[in-house]
Design a protein with these regions (language model features):
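Metallo-beta-lactamase
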Residues: 88-140, 256-285
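Active-site-proximal loop/helix segments of hydrolase catalytic cores
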Residues: 138-143, 151-177, 182-184, 189-191, ...
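Acidic, Ser/Thr-rich peripheral helices and adjacent loops at domain boundaries
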Residues: 96, 100, 249-269, 325-348
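Pre-active-site segment of Zn-dependent metallo-hydrolases
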Residues: 9-14, 18-72, 76-115, 162-169, ...
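Core dinuclear metal-dependent hydrolase active-site scaffold
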Residues: 1-45, 118-169, 281, 288, ...
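Cap/insert and terminal regions of metallo-dependent hydrolase folds
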Residues: 163-241, 315, 338-397
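Hard-cation-handling environments
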Residues: 201-319, 324, 379
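Active-site neighborhood of phospho(di)ester-bond hydrolases with catalytic His/Asp-centered motifs
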Residues: 28-30, 47-58, 62-63, 74-78, ...
Length: 409
């Protein structure tokens, strides 16, 4: 079968890969990089079937462009489909507000949802003599790996985490011939999660004890809920704002994808929700505010940031990746942010914590060795070659975006 990455092979972001053979063409994921303006993958040819691993924009953000055009089936978990719909609609909303290119229409999103064929972990379908199974990826609720089997089996990981988080269990390895695997954390390992949680909670209490406000900018999908679950046993006035509220409700609609539904339900009850703009005045008087956007570039976080930025007693606790050319990265590197076009110095405390939902360098290596593939194909990484010294017993393939290569499937 012929394979080609349309994006995301040698970079983190805008994922997309075609598989072509047996008279059919499959597209696995089709995302965008949510930069300013967004960056898109290479144009997709006509597609017969599309497989979506999960709902983050770098994996799902361009799916409506293909499905709106080709009316192809979209195989994914029902939870990923519903959250992806939120993300796609938000992408259009931002494009209109910022005068960016609109890569698809609202009608394309509607057609995409009509073309969804729900699958869940353990399900298997057959398309043109190729069996396709779905496995738990452990990244965020509803995230999946796909196993394609004909003469041999091929696993496509999407984004994975092999260690359990509060929100989801970890991914389990499975023997395979070909393993397409992400390499986001090609050059470092995460600190033990328990240590990170302990340090984070200690800082929260320290800031509140000195009379400050704790602002936790979070991604809507996964990180907001993970942090809410971590904070739920604290006896403080806590608020949650932004799209994370809607995502939490969707997660609770699909408890089968959660490690412990009761823990998330309990966390949701402990937080006050900002349901209308007027509630933000009350939220600003709270002690802990968990809000989108996770990189400080837009959303409700800007208003809260503006409120506390000159208060040395308060703190911004970053809990997610801060990409280049974002407010979050500028804050880390220069101690300032851009608000309403003006560069502002930030005087409150800043701390960063590693709550990644991706497997780290050593976890990826352990996963590969447990799968014991003949061929390892790295993707979703800008430093894939750093894995090579540890994988001399495997045939490692580092495809470039736009490069076609063949594998037995």
């Amino acid at each position: 079968m012929k394979f080609k990455f349309l994006g995301g092979a040698d970079m983190v972001g805008r994922m997309g890969m075609t598989m072509e053979g047996d008279g059919m063409r499959i597209l696995v994921e089709y995302g965008l990089s949510p930069t300013k303006p967004p960056e898109f993958p290479l144009p997709a040819p006509k597609i017969d079937h599309l497989f979506l691993t999960h709902c983050h924009l770098d994996h799902c953000g361009m799916v409506p462009q293909v499905v709106g055009r080709d009316r192809c089936e979209v195989f994914t978990t029902p939870l990923s489909a519903e959250v992806a719909e939120l993300m796609m609609k938000d992408t259009l909303k931002i494009a209109k507000a910022e005068d960016y290119v609109q890569p698809y229409s609202g009608d394309d999103i509607e057609r995409t949802m009509q073309c969804v064929v729900p699958m869940t972990y353990g399900d298997e379908i057959t398309i043109n003599h190729v069996d396709v199974g779905m496995l738990d990826a452990g990244h965020v609720p509803g995230a999946a790996m796909f196993e394609f089997s004909r003469d041999v089996n091929t696993i496509y990981s999407g984004d994975i985490h092999t260690e359990a988080q509060r929100l989801v269990k970890g991914a389990k390895p499975k023997d395979c011939h070909n393993l397409f695997i992400e390499g986001t954390y090609c050059d470092r390992n995460h600190p033990p999660r328990k240590n990170t949680e302990r340090d984070f909670l200690a800082k929260v209490e320290e800031v509140i004890d000195r009379g400050g406000t704790v602002l936790v900018p979070c991604f809507a999908v996964g990180r907001t809920q993970e942090i809410m679950m971590l904070l739920k046993d604290l006896d403080y006035e806590m608020w949650v704002d932004g799209m994370g509220r809607s995502v939490t409700r969707l997660f609770l609609d699909y408890p089968e994808y959660l490690r412990d539904e009761r823990q998330l339900r309990s966390a949701r009850k402990k937080f006050n929700e900002v349901r209308r703009p007027g509630s933000r005045e009350a939220a600003m008087k709270g002690q802990i505010i968990v809000t989108t956007g996770g990189m400080l570039d837009g959303g409700p976080v800007i208003r809260y940031l503006n409120k506390i930025k000159n208060d040395p007693k308060s703190a911004i606790l970053l809990v997610g990746y801060q990409a280049e050319d974002t407010n979050g990265r500028m804050l880390m590197d220069q101690g300032c942010v851009t608000i309403d076009g003006e560069v502002c110095k930030v005087a409150c405390e800043l701390q960063k914590y590693d709550f990644s939902a991706h497997a780290d360098h050593d976890q990826i290596l352990d996963f590969i060795k447990a799968c014991d593939p003949d061929n390892v194909i790295f993707m979703h990484s800008d430093g894939r070659e750093k894995f090579l010294p540890d994988l001399t017993d495997y045939n490692v393939i580092l495809p470039m975006t736009g490069e076609e290569f063949e594998l037995d499937v």
